[in-house]
A protein has these predicted regions:
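Glycine-rich flexible loops
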Residues: 1-231
Length: 231
């Protein structure tokens, strides 16, 4: 019988995916999420299974992966398991990952545009820009490598011609940051329709980050809702 704590964590992965679709920052089976099994950075993680609608996923369907890339569950892990694995390996500060194909973040990613500090909330992502990675085919090691590069010193990035990634100490905060990035992408896109935005200087973003908590995980948790699907 599955321990209650493990079942609850697996269910939290499902609930996170349902919320990201309900919030409109993802659709269909395109996104995915993962969370560390324990606070220990050497621990494995739980990740959404591949190609199952979120509302059909049960705790038993969530896949447990080890940091060596192995998994023993019956289901196949998300097709994007490689970048989840590599982020968990290389970022001990990361406790959870949310990957979405939000409309505005993906629009900018298709233009291969980073999001500059046109608004002070950019500091939530850990620096003066939200970078856009290079392009690589989904599910490949090349995509994982370029995502890691774009996330260096950051907690979120866009994936060229693909979507976005947000990380956090837990699923609640990773999802909140993903929502913040989508909101910023929408505001930036709208600003560009009118004119050229005024970009805040790096030292102002540093000050804002310090006020958030030494560039810490300060994203307001706006994430709520349910229903949706998995990649």
């Amino acid at each position: 019988m599955m321990p209650a704590k493990e079942r609850a964590l697996r269910q939290e992965v499902i609930d996170t995916c349902l919320r990201m679709n309900a919030l409109g920052i993802n659709q269909g089976t395109s996104g995915n999420a993962s969370v560390r099994v324990a606070d220990d950075p050497a621990a494995g993680f739980f990740i959404t299974p591949s190609a199952i609608p979120y509302e059909e996923i049960r705790p038993e369907d969530i896949v447990k992966m080890e940091l060596d890339g192995s998994h023993s569950d019956n289901r196949r892990p998300s097709s994007e398991w490689r970048f989840h694995l590599d982020i968990m390996r290389h970022r001990p500060d990361c406790g959870a990952i949310v990957h979405t194909h939000g409309m505005f973040a993906t629009t900018l990613a298709c233009l291969r545009m980073e999001i500059p500090a046109f608004h002070y909330m950019i500091a939530q992502a850990g620096g003066p820009t939200i970078r856009c990675s290079g392009y690589a085919t989904f599910g490949t090691q090349e995509l994982s490598d370029t995502a890691l590069e774009a996330l260096e010193g950051r907690r979120a990035c866009l994936l060229a011609n693909h979507g976005m990634i947000a990380i956090g100490p837990n699923l609640k905060k990773a999802l909140a940051l993903a929502l913040e990035v989508e909101t910023l992408a929408a505001m930036y896109w709208r600003t560009l329709q009118i004119g050229k935005p005024v970009i805040l200087p790096d030292d102002e973003i540093e000050r804002v980050g310090a006020k958030f908590g030494t560039m810490g995980y300060g994203a307001v948790d706006k994430a709520a809702g349910n229903k949706g699907q998995a990649a």
